[in-house]
């Protein structure tokens, strides 16, 4: 588990570890403990529901991964998965794939 710290430099010095099964005192107020230690949560509007996915355009993938990605993920308060989507016209890619498939078929014919 990674420590809950903003900077990577502080991560090694930070003493509090984030554990998804441990509730902070603020979160614990919104839960009831039932028999057997089972917790019941009341719904709240501002809570993230896992899995959290951040959808980013493929055309800016290099920019996000090199420069902005670390700041985006550092400012996002929960674990998230990055998903890149195609935001450009993919017709040229489809034509290239068809040409490549035709070439491959021609190469493997006896």
Curated annotation (Swiss-Prot):
Compartments, as annotated in UniProt: Nucleus
GO biological process: embryonic pattern specification; negative regulation of transcription by RNA polymerase II; secondary heart field specification
Ranges of biased composition (kind: Acidic residues): 87-99
GO molecular-function term, one example from the UniProt record: transcription corepressor activity
Positions of disulphide bridges: none
Any one cellular-component term (Gene Ontology): nucleus
Keywords associated with the record: Developmental protein, Nucleus, Transcription, Transcription regulation
Matches recorded under Pfam families: Ripply
Similarity remark: Belongs to the ripply family.
Stated name of the protein: Protein ripply3
Organism: Danio rerio (Zebrafish)
